[in-house]
Amino acid sequence: MNDVSQKAEILLSSSKPVPKSYVPKLGKGDVKDKFEAMQRAREERNQRRSRDEKQRRKEQYIREREWNRRKQEIKDMLASDEEEEPSKVEKAYVPKLTGTVKGKFDEMEKHRQEEQRKRTEEERKRRIEQDLLEKRKMQRELAKRAEQEGDDSLLITVVPAKSYRAAANRKDPEDLDREHRNGRVSQEEEKTRHEEECRALKEAKCLSLVMDDETEAKKESRFPGKLKSTFEELERQRQENRKKQAEEEARRRLEEERRAFEEARRNMVNEEDESQDTETVFKEYRPGKLRLSFEEIERQRREEEKRKAEEEARRRMEEEKKAFAEARRSMVLDDDSPEIYKAVSQESLTPGKLEINFEQLLRQKMEEERRRTEEERRQKLEMEKQEFEQLRQEMGKEEEENESFGLSREYEELIKLKRSGSIQAKNLKSKFEKIGQLSEKEVQKKIEEERAKRRAIDLEIKEREAENFHEDDDVDVKPAKKSESPFTHKVNMKARFEQMAKARQEEEQRRIEEQKLLRMQFEQKEIDAALQKKREDDEEEEGSIVNGSTTEDEEQTRSGAPWFKKPLRNTSVVDSEPVRFTVKVTGEPKPEVTWWFEGELLQDGEDYQYIERGETYCLYLPETFPEDGGEYMCKAVNSKGSAASTCILTIEMDDY
């Protein structure tokens, strides 16, 4: 009985179907034991299957985790060599790699996935068939149990021939167990071999990727790649670069102008110091015979006036800078509240205060004009210094020659005149008269003033020359007429100095007149603009009173719809200067205010800054460009209605 029960248990635990012809005959007392044995075998089989399934899932989880780790390492290796990884993976044409390790790995990976899919499909079908067989087996066992407990006539009769045939076809349970174990061992070997192949292929792929990266670092890849950025991104980057370049150019130009102004101011101070030093040197080392007191006094007076004017202008400029800094500091202190400042670079808003840029424009123009005049003045002063040095050297040489040789030549001519007679004397006299008439009329007055001083000097020279040559008393009469010959040359040089001084004075006067005219024109423009603005405000107020706008305002305030107490106005600004659009809007509930440019909504940011303080709303542009010119609109919306106000911004180019 034990052998029969063991064989029945083995048959029941096996997965092969049991032929119906073989029914072992057991006693009625062993049916319960048989059922319990079947139940235990079924539970053990289920437990063994669940353990195998858990083990298989655990191994699969470990394999997948290892594969994901290796794949992440490969991705990290690839990402470390690339400069930038595109955030969005776009579909692109990737050529098929054949004849390389990558291509072989891809083919083997596809083949492995196909085999895995086939194995899973076969395993699923096998499990379904096994479940069906187990259900049929359970039904047969229940039927046998019912037959044994109930009617014996329902038992299946055993045919010897069929039983022999079935016994011949039936395999031994030990053979079945051996085959089952061999199949499981072969499956494990196949699984380990497959894992080793995958590991080898992964290592080969990593090596190939590293080698490919090294070769790509040395030479460009021959396979086409995808674009790293689209055309829109390139265009956006180009526009941003252009805008940054324009900002840097404006900043650089401003810095250069500031440095040039500082350099010019330092040079002007240095030149003033040098001019003072040169004046002291000239006063100390000037020759006694070239002392032109009138010209020197006049030049000193003009230089003193010029220095005073420059010091006054510099002092006024410093006062304006201090006043501007104090005003700006007070504005920052007044408007320093977290409601207004949405950014650190945002300027303060003072309600009721109108910013006018023509003060800054006037200051810039005055600085440009001052720099230009100072540069011209320095150049002319240098030229005059050079001419003065050259003339002084020439005059010194001529004076020395005249002092040493002039009188000797005169006395020789006088001796010749005594010998030649009165005709040559008359010709020489007419010659000197013509030379005297060649002097200009404007210089005659100053010549007469200097004649007394020169005459005394000439008399002393004549006396010394008379003593040297030991001439007769007749010589003391005629050299008096000849003594004016060197004086004519001095008169011409003096006239030349006078002409130069007069030309400089006229040029300075003309420049002062031009500056006055420009200042008057600019002030007149400011006055006209202020009067025009006041006239427009008066007309708007009168029109609002005449048209009954006060009642409309009262109706609008009662209705709660937004309306503009102070609408936008057309304005113009110089290129790269800041601009602010200010409106006053009221409404109940509080309206939401947005700003628009050429039909496009402007977002609050660094380029376009929204400022809000009570009913006053502002749009502030820290810096303007030529493309910022156009139509701007302020739109206010609440639940009761909406309102809008528009204006035109004009960008003027800075030509100076």
Curated annotation (Swiss-Prot):
It is found in: Cytoplasm, Cytoskeleton; Cell junction, Adherens junction; Cytoplasm, Myofibril, Sarcomere, Z line. Residues 11-26 have a biased composition (Low complexity). Residues 1-131, 165-198, 215-284, 468-492, 529-564 are annotated as: Disordered. Interacts with F-actin. GO terms for cellular component: adherens junction; axon; cell-substrate junction; cytoskeleton; focal adhesion; plasma membrane; Z disc. Residues 562-650 form the Ig-like domain. Expressed in brain, testis, spleen and fibroblasts (at protein level). Not detected in liver, kidney or epithelial cells (at protein level). Residues 27-78, 103-131, 169-198, 216-269 have a biased composition (Basic and acidic residues). This is Nexilin. Keywords: Actin-binding, Cell junction, Cytoplasm, Cytoskeleton, Immunoglobulin domain, Phosphoprotein. GO terms for molecular function: actin filament binding; cell-cell adhesion mediator activity; structural constituent of muscle. Its main location: cytoplasm. It holds the Pfam family I-set. GO terms for biological process: axon guidance; dendrite self-avoidance; homophilic cell adhesion via plasma membrane adhesion molecules; regulation of cell migration; regulation of cytoskeleton organization; response to bacterium. The modification Phosphothreonine is found at T350, T551. The modification Phosphoserine is found at S80, S221, S330, S337, S345, S544, S549. InterPro entries: Ig-like_dom, Ig-like_dom_sf, Ig-like_fold, Ig_I-set, Ig_sub. Involved in regulating cell migration through association with the actin cytoskeleton. Has an essential role in the maintenance of Z line and sarcomere integrity.
